[in-house]
Amino acid sequence: MSTHTDGIAPHGGHLINRIATAAERQEFLDQADHLPQIQLDERATSDLVMIAIGGFSPLKGFLERADYETVVEDMRLTNGLVWSIPVTLSVSEEIADPLKEGNWVRLNDPEGNFIGVLELTQKYHYNKAHEAKNVYGTEDSQHPGVQVVYEQGAVNLAGPVWLLQRDAHPLFPKYQIDPIESRQGFKERGWNTIVGFQTRNPIHRAHEYIQKCALEVVDGLFLHPLVGATKSDDIPADVRMRCYEIMMEKYFPQDRVILAINPSAMRYAGPREAIFHALVRKNYGCTHFIVGRDHAGVGDYYGTYEAQEMFDQFKPEELGIVPMKFEHAFYCTRTQQMATTKTSPSLKEERIHLSGTKVREMLRRGELPPPEFSRPEVAAELINAMENQGK
């Protein structure tokens, strides 16, 4: 089943739906005890969900070899569509060997629950170092994305998938808004232009500034924090969501913003992941996407505006979503407001640069981020969470 409501077309033209019908689900359940089974990790589980709900349209499953190779090499699927991140299911030789192409495979979540089915069309080996270098720009195992590639299995399992059923998110059910629902929500609000914002950090003042700048020129903001797998030192999703709720309640016009969770896992692939994040938001119905400083970056692996420059490699019609590029915002002590070099006459010493990394470092030291960094209610929530975490 492929469908979408009015508005911007999903990537590839159709919104993919790989959630099993009641009849399909019963068929899978009847055969469950006779199917070979594999246990998915947190990232593979979230990838299965994103494929099933259409967030990764046009993908209907995990990539076959030909698509995998063109994505790694050229950031395109074999049909020419732009796709910058390989979405694969990697397992060990021991797990892959007994599996036969053409058969169904039962997919279990990390707790062992039966959640999906893979129609195994291919199993193939791949070059981990080559994937790391092309996708992440480095073979350094200290890079969290590269580390995942090196530690995962040596064989990719490919083929279409089905999600047994769409369950409510255990922590954030009210913010679980799938692409078909976000598109309907935009339509009901009469929004024709919607800007998406990706984040794995609590909203600090620089984020708030660029979101509101974008909101000045579009109908609505789709605030879409990622709640899938992240680095261990990233601030936990439940803490971040409470911060977003505070911001929504006190600092944003609620009729112009929709807050929803993004169940994806972070890859930390910098420029390539920026393209990926934009295409995912296009599937959710966004017409624009905010690309800020070092989007989806980690450490010093990528240049400050390398992710923004990546968008210039593609024709606008190939992406089908408009990147809104913002310079590094800072708090200007001369004008006492948020600004960038485009709007502030300040000297370097009059600029307080903000980042999620700086906020995390202050919290670890037990310091309350100043109002130039973070809204006071958000700062209080963060410091309270860190104190409770230490107990």
From Swiss-Prot:
One of its GO terms (biological process) is sulfate assimilation. Its EC number is 2.7.7.4. One of its GO terms (molecular function) is sulfate adenylyltransferase (ATP) activity. InterPro entries: ATP-Sase_PUA-like_dom, PUA-like_sf, Rossmann-like_a/b/a_fold, SO4_adenylyltransferase_pro, Sulfurylase_cat_dom, Sulphate_adenylyltransferase. Pathway: Sulfur metabolism; hydrogen sulfide biosynthesis; sulfite from sulfate: step 1/3. It catalyses: sulfate + ATP + H(+) = adenosine 5'-phosphosulfate + diphosphate. Keywords: ATP-binding, Nucleotide-binding, Nucleotidyltransferase, Transferase. Belongs to the sulfate adenylyltransferase family. This is Sulfate adenylyltransferase. It comes from Rippkaea orientalis (strain PCC 8801 / RF-1) (Cyanothece sp. (strain PCC 8801)).
